[in-house]
């Protein structure tokens, strides 16, 4: 078979881009060589519809062991009674929960997209907003933190069947217990999407939502530092509250409903090569050095937020408890959009993403904010002093977005700087 020169050339170019630049996108990270090896392994050849020891295909005895290992490790990592490691993505994990818990047209409540929420928590262009009636809560205008009073008011007024906590651009920990109490008042299922802070939660640096939520979903990349994929977890399994029964009349456990909602409800065959890579990532997350890594992620984020703040940038919520921060550019550069800022920084090989901020007066295509995160740069071995240096480089670019010469000089500094940092340091 003739080698596909074009695609491998592009892969090499992407490798160079990742190595030469500063990666600050909060949802990105660099996986270990062994995770990468498993994700590209011969396991991609195997079809395995169903679950371990309950497959619709023969020859699954080895992938059964692999998937069961991933299940056991994930349970141990988050102290879960039940997990499912098959979701192809976080969005499909969320879709599974919706299918299991809601009927089309039912109300559910999630954090608004412009306040840091995720597409799959009720965006009108997403399955969640198209098939179900989305209600939203937001953050407080004064301090940028979750408006729990608004959340409770909407919940008590509309009685949603599902309440979602979790975000894609929120830098503080959550009061899961408070939301669970609200959910219990109205008989709602409480789901937490911990996709962003999952690694910090695994390292016990943030509150574990499995102690409070009925159901938890996550991605396996981001802070968890595994392959791209999703997971669903429960701290404790329970009888479904709707009285759904088996053909023999026994009330189904929630785990049974979630399993069947994922397969055959949302997906067909699982990606066993990715499940193997997930298993390795869970193994890595159970090692002592992983906790050290996550502590550094958090320290780096706090130093970066402090440096940005002292340079005149406004951090939404005033700081960070996790791995990310949302910067409102309007306080320092009123006429600079998030899109313009992103383009300028990417030109200097500093990769970030534009992001809406609470009460934004710009469209989602322009935005007034930038989101920064430290998981990827920390994986490369970066520590606190480099965070301060990076903020200086960011400020130089954003103060000179129309000056190609200055942006180019920053790019050269970035490329020289990153030569000392391997893609995966620990």
Curated annotation (Swiss-Prot):
Q: What is its main location?
A: cytoplasm
Tell me the keywords, alphabetical order: Amino-acid biosynthesis, Cytoplasm, One-carbon metabolism, Pyridoxal phosphate, Transferase
* An example Gene Ontology molecular-function term: glycine hydroxymethyltransferase activity
**InterPro entries annotated for this entry?**
PyrdxlP-dep_Trfase (IPR015424), PyrdxlP-dep_Trfase_major (IPR015421), PyrdxlP-dep_Trfase_small (IPR015422), Ser_HO-MeTrfase (IPR001085), Ser_HO-MeTrfase-like (IPR049943), Ser_HO-MeTrfase_PLP_BS (IPR019798), SHMT-like_dom (IPR039429)
Cited HAMAP family: SHMT
Similarity annotation: Belongs to the SHMT family.
This chain belongs to which protein, by name?
A: Serine hydroxymethyltransferase
- Recorded source organism is Azobacteroides pseudotrichonymphae genomovar. CFP2
